Amino acid sequence: MDVLKEVLSLDQDKFDQLKETSRDKTNETDDPFENYLKDCKFKAPSNKDQSPFAKLKSLQETHSNNEAAINIIIPQLIDYLTEFTNRLSNYTQDLDFIKKKSNELQSLLEYNSTKLAHISPMVNDLMIPPELIDDIIKGKINESWQDNITFIADKEEIYNKYRSNNLDQDNKDAENSAMLAPKDFDKLCQLLDILKNVILERSKRLIISKIKTLRSHNPVPSQRIQNKLLKVQKIFPFIRDNNLSLALELRQAYCYTMKWYYREYFSRYIRSLTILQFQQIDSQFALGNGLSTTSVSGFNNSPSLFFSNYLTTSASNAFYNKLPVTDEKIDKYFQIKKRLNILTQEDNTVMVSQIAENNTTKNYIEIGFKNLNLAILDNCTVEYHFLKDFFAMNGDNFEEINGLLEQIFQPTFDEATTYTQQLIQYNYDIFGVLISIRVANQLQFESERRGIPSMFDSFLNGQLIQLWPRFQQLVDFQCESLRKAAITTNVAKYAGNSSTSNSSPLTSPHELTVQFGKFLSSFLTLAITHKQSIDERSEPLYNSIIRLRNDFETVMTKCSKKTKSPERFLATNYMYLYNNLQQLHLHLNINDSDAQNYNFDSAENVGTKVANDDDNDSSVPLIIRETENHFKTLVEAFTRN
């Protein structure tokens, strides 16, 4: 390059300046080619001051340099350019080859893309990942494991489409060719069948293991097992869809197991309830007993003692602890406002067996009845929802689940019915029997609200079939006790004033009237069953109250004949009952939002004012209104006389 610069008479400074100019002045507006020519323009050396010899010498040197350039530099430059041309030609050939290959690859890519557009869906449809296969075979069965069931079910549907397309020999068009299965499709089908069988076998073993756990000697809460099964509830529909007979066998095995489970569980629970201590309500708790002439504080000739063997046997001691009965206990028994809590309390928690076995509190029979039947209802509810959610079959209906529940709980129902029979058979607690009837009514409506099948309602109807006849027997007993009551004119004793010598039977109520008033108010309170209207006249309670009322009026008529003014005596006693009924009626209107929760004490000073609001009266039971009107009519009749 130095020789070339010398031949072209290029100054180094000029050359450097040219490089700097081309590098830095990129925004220069002049033509770069013109600038180059201007900078590289050959300038002949000035010969003004040179001698001819010097000029000759200079020309010789120039000639020598030119010859050297021609003989040495130019050939090398020619060789370099020739080699460069050859290399450029080779590069051009390589580029042509690359271009040709690129076109070939582009064509191949387009071809493969066209093919993959048809093959990729098939691969995605038929592919089963190895990780999924490993999880199906070895993975823990839990909520995430159920995704394998969904995957296999989807694959089975896709495989069935390919099978149907293969069977269709006329399907030759290109549009449906993508749905034609590959040659090794049969092997894929075999793999799918194997995986289905693995899922079926593992699911079956899981369900059987849970059923065996319920049958173990160590007590295991059934709801814990049910919750574990509900977390993997997709396994049973898969069994049902692929092996219906196996699904039915598993469900039947579960039903047999739960039948045994509930029978054992409730047998132990009933034994615990049997240990409960109950109040002694015997034949001494009768109308006419506990009065001045029929005191039970000592041995006497009370008329009610005549019926002490009316419905009793020695077996009654198995349920009731015999304790001395006092007049105060009899008087307290006829007031049941505290016992109404069992019908109005919002907390419906069942008494656990440990508490029942260690409870030293005296209980009434409705406590045992409600706890047992409420426990059965709660378990029926849980079992119903589990059968519906886990063991659902195609086309399952309400009647089939009802049949399964009845199969599971029938032994339990039989034991509960036997317990109820033992509970009331030797007991004279007429209020306890009636409260138990109201508890059964409430449980019937609660089961309907929960959507429980009719089997539980049928069970409660069976309980009511036992309770109502026993109630009628006790009504007969009370009516007979009323008819045997002593015919006297003794007035009632009041707290703080035990002397009755200054009280006249014409101005103060008879002691039997006060006792009957408490009894009647308690009975009428229990006439309120539930919010849904029913035909009250169809209930035995309606006619029973009328029977008791008629027998009481017969006794009062006999007692009035021993007074100077029978009409005034009857008017005084009926007025007392009428005022009691007015108080009850008034409080039913005040507490209309919760018609079964009353506070009788706060109404002691209420006069003869009657609530005449028709809207409020509609919430008061018919028997209360009729009884109130009946005594009102009697008061008016005897007052006019």
Curated annotation (Swiss-Prot):
Any single Pfam family the record assigns to this protein: Vps52_C
Organism: Saccharomyces cerevisiae (strain ATCC 204508 / S288c) (Baker's yeast)
Topological relation to the membrane, as annotated: Peripheral membrane protein
One GO cellular component term noted in the UniProt record for this chain: Golgi apparatus
Subcellular locations according to the entry: Golgi apparatus, trans-Golgi network membrane; Endosome membrane; Cytoplasm, Cytoskeleton
This protein's record includes keyword Phosphoprotein: yes
Family according to the record: Belongs to the VPS52 family.
Name under which the protein is recorded: Vacuolar protein sorting-associated protein 52
Comment field (misc): Present with 3130 molecules/cell in log phase SD medium.
Main subcellular location: Golgi
